[in-house]
């Protein structure tokens, strides 16, 4: 199962998210749930880098697939929109395939 934890501040802005584990929906190379989650998360990070000037840190472990993304500067409206779009897509995956494969956890920091 993949677990994604979204950390929001008191203004409900996402400051950080972590992604760990593999969905386990199917065999390696054919797991459409894991691939969908990966595309959403990686595309969001790439889009923030390409289309905004917001500073962030991102640690990724290529072997495990774990990602730890954190804004280190004020969050722009564009970056916030990209993150919220990712969350929307992740919620749809969770609704379609269930919590057996994807757990979304929201925490206030």
Positions of PLM-derived features:
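N-terminal intrinsically disordered, cationic/polar leader segments
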Residues: 1-32, 41-42, 46-109
């Amino acid at each position: 199962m993949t677990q994604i934890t979204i950390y929001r501040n008191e203004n409900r802005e996402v400051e950080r998210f972590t992604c760990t584990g593999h969905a386990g929906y199917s065999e390696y190379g054919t797991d459409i749930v894991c691939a969908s989650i990966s595309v959403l998360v990686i595309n969001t990070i790439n889009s923030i880098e390409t289309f905004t000037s917001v500073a962030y840190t991102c640690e990724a472990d290529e072997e495990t697939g774990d990602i730890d993304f954190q804004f280190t500067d004020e969050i722009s409206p564009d970056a916030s929109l990209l993150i919220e779009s990712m969350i929307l897509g992740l919620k749809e995956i969770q609704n379609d395939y269930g919590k057996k494969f994807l757990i979304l956890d929201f925490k206030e920091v």
